Amino acid sequence: MAKLQSSFKNMLLSLTLIALVAAAALAGVYMLTKDPIAAAMTEKQQNAIMQVLPDVEGDIRIAEAEESNGVTLYKAYVGEEWIGTAVEASTEGNQNMPFGGTFRLMVGFDQVGNVVNYEVLEQAETPGLGALMTTWFKSKSNILGKNPATTNFSVSKDGGDVDAITASTITSRAFLEVVVKAYNGIAQQPMPIEATSGATQLTTEEGGQQ
């Protein structure tokens, strides 16, 4: 019996030591990779901002980030002229979205609220569907060049004006709701008088969100 107890203590001690070594190794890996990962994420975010803004001549200056209506705004200027806004929005905090995972988008709008472009910053969707999300809506027959205030940013199955990803209506609904969420962030912001024609915040009943 004493030998059995001794073996049990040795086994417990060994497991404890293994756990401590593993924890220390994980902590070391985290410390080594934390800064490179953060730098890569920042670079991806900055690249996405430039990708979704209007194509204009001159040096684009990005103003300090602003929070609005649950999204992050990056207003862009050439000199003193405001040319558009890149908006970072995600499914996080949206309990009513019919979507099991989470994703983050960077959506670009021009001065009147038309969608210029978008980039997927992060997504936890099924790999095939996630890849489709990055390109599916990038055509003028889909959402580019359109304004959520004048176009129903819902899938056609729900009576909207946007074609859903094939066999993935739920993901398409969630994607479009995030785009409308991004638009509502800029709709609450002051805009030049000549650029206010599309700056009307949407409600669930008005089209963009279901």
Residue spans for each PLM region:
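Flexible, solvent-exposed loop/hinge segments and secondary-structure transition points
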Residues: 2-210
